[in-house]
Amino acid sequence: MALSLEEFIHSLDLRTLPRVLEIQSGFYFEGSIYEMFGNECCLSTGEVIKITDLKIKKIMAEICEHVEGCVSPQSFELPMNFPGLFKIVADTTPYLTMEEITKANHIRPSRPNHPCFYHQKDIKLENLIIKKGERIMLNSVEEINGEIMVNCSVLRNHQNHSFTLPLSQEGEFYECEDEHIYTLKEIIQWKIPKNRTRTVILTGFSAKWDSTNPFPRGFYGAVILKPVYEIQAVMKFRKDIVRILPSLDVEVKDITDSYDANWFLQVLSTQDLYEMANKQFPIVAEVIEAPQGNQLPISILQPGKTIVIHKKCQASKILASEIRSNSSKRHFLIPTSYKGKFKRRPREFPTAYDLEIAKSEKEPLHVVATKAFHSPFEELSSVSVGDEFLVHHSQTTEVLCEGIKKVMDGLACEKILKNSREVALLPLYMDGGFVEVIHDKKLYQISELCAQFRLPFNVKVSVRDLFIEKDILAAIPGLQLEESITNSYLLISDLANPKKCWEIPVGRVNMTVQLVNNFSGDTGSFLVSTLVEEITEEQYYLIRRYEKSFLHPPPRPPKHPSVEKIELTPLSLAKQKTVNLPKSPKSVHVDRSKKLYSNQAGLDSKVPAGCQNDLADLEKEKRKTEATAVTEIFKTEEHKK
């Protein structure tokens, strides 16, 4: 049965792609050539096309005064690279079957933060009863004994209970509230249901936005996102991808079951390649669409280039950031095979608790205070700017608070005086500032640093990697090695030189290839060339959020005792003022975001641990006393070298 192209796309289940369509009728006559978004396309009656994907071409946004109703909505296009951070508002329109949910939502086991729904009534299964209103997480869709089933789970008493639901399962399923914060890119990729709009709340920014802000000045509120889709298709005898708007006035007929799809290009994305079985590699492919911003030193990923995809793999990288006082830092992924040599740089510690975490049995931690702190207890030490300490270990002590003895956690140190040393006990809750004094002159390779020291760790490249033509790390004055992460890669090479391979990151390189044939050459040993990869602010943010999501967050520092009764120092007051800030890394609009989320508990845990002190660090660097102390320390370090 013939349908308009728009009707067909509306009813299309994306899990069934690709689909082969025959053009039935429309305003496009045989032999006519039309310009469609930069691609010439002949859509004559009887023409056959293969739809490979449905992508969001652009996002239209409408500002709402309230989530429930809009007042004088003004629609505007939101740039796809807009660095806003958003909280998703749960959709109030129910889904009536599980099939409707799976057609509209992205459900993949590889995706974090799986979609969650609740049912208006109890669902009785063979071995389990899903209670009314209970949060159901949809993990994946797969065929079981010839029937398509949805793998689900519910969390009870900190334990997951798994079960399956058929696509035919009926009822009123409502979307659950989602407390996570998302970038616009994440929402576009997998948080906008097909054929629906998405209401979100702008909470902050992940990076500085140099272009004109499309939102009103100071706006933080509800926005309706309306996607405009484009169809990605291939045609016989063409090697490029055709992009068509679903609103194109033609009628089509689905002939997938009666047509040999092998007549078309087998076009695969980077993600499609990674999802192939291991036994299908190595394969030969031709690059159809090359990635933008390709960092490979050779033109290996150019359109028309024939490459060998040897296998898929995972590799460890060190996530590093440039040490700078402002927010516009550069970020890198450094392979563990990097041959450059590093020398240590002083670390900064915003609290005494950070000193306790950073101390090492390998060597005593020597620091200089950059902030003054007055202790309200005789049993605990006060600190002046310029005081030097050797950090030893944590210990408890009794203090007298309003006539009542209380046990407090402290950090045992040695205070270095001019001709002697004295014992000092710093309160762990102390919100101060310290800079490390480096005595170690040794040069380290990155593998040695990761093995001998706890990350994060500050370094500088002293000897560049001579095996790299252009070592981009050599010109960076200071780097913070933040954490070791594991990324997914495709190992590829030029067909003309299959022994020299390169790693292509699956999540950060978007390319399209056409499969040619299986590779019949020698699949023995080959040389893998790894690069230092510079990543964008958004990519850095996503890595920090998801690559370590399976780890528990670090323990929280001790709280100041009896805050209401004890006279607060300016430092502790500053700490209180920042305790409920929204956890959006490098957020530009702090005050407004704080008001928006001041009553939401648990938001801290949704943010990369390394980003939580950014605001405090920036505030700290503004204070003149600390800046002076830091300058003196670095001068001392340079003099020693």
From Swiss-Prot:
Q: Which InterPro entries match?
A: CABIT_dom, THEMIS
GO BP terms = adaptive immune response; negative T cell selection; positive T cell selection; T cell receptor signaling pathway
Give the top-rank taxon of the lineage listed in the UniProt record for this protein: Eukaryota
Tell where it localizes. Answer: Cytoplasm; Nucleus
User: Pfam families from the entry?
Assistant: CABIT
CABIT 1: region residues: 1-259
- Kindly list the positions at which Phosphoserine occurs in this protein: 584
How does it get modified after it is made?
A: Phosphorylated on Tyr residues quickly after TCR stimulation.
Q: Name one GO cellular component term.
A: nucleus
Keyword vocabulary terms for this entry: Adaptive immunity, Cytoplasm, Developmental protein, Immunity, Nucleus, Phosphoprotein
* Stretches for region CABIT 2: 260-518
Q: Which family does it belong to?
A: Belongs to the themis family.
Question: What does the subunit section of this Swiss-Prot or TrEMBL entry state?
Answer: Interacts with PLCG1, ITK, GRB2, and LAT.
Function field: Plays a central role in late thymocyte development by controlling both positive and negative T-cell selection. Required to sustain and/or integrate signals required for proper lineage commitment and maturation of T-cells. Regulates T-cell development through T-cell antigen receptor (TCR) signaling and in particular through the regulation of calcium influx and phosphorylation of Erk.
Q: Per its record, how is this protein called by name?
A: Protein THEMIS
Q: Which organism is it from?
A: Bos taurus (Bovine)
Tell me the classification of the organism that encodes this protein: Eukaryota, Metazoa, Chordata, Craniata, Vertebrata
Gene from which the chain derives: THEMIS
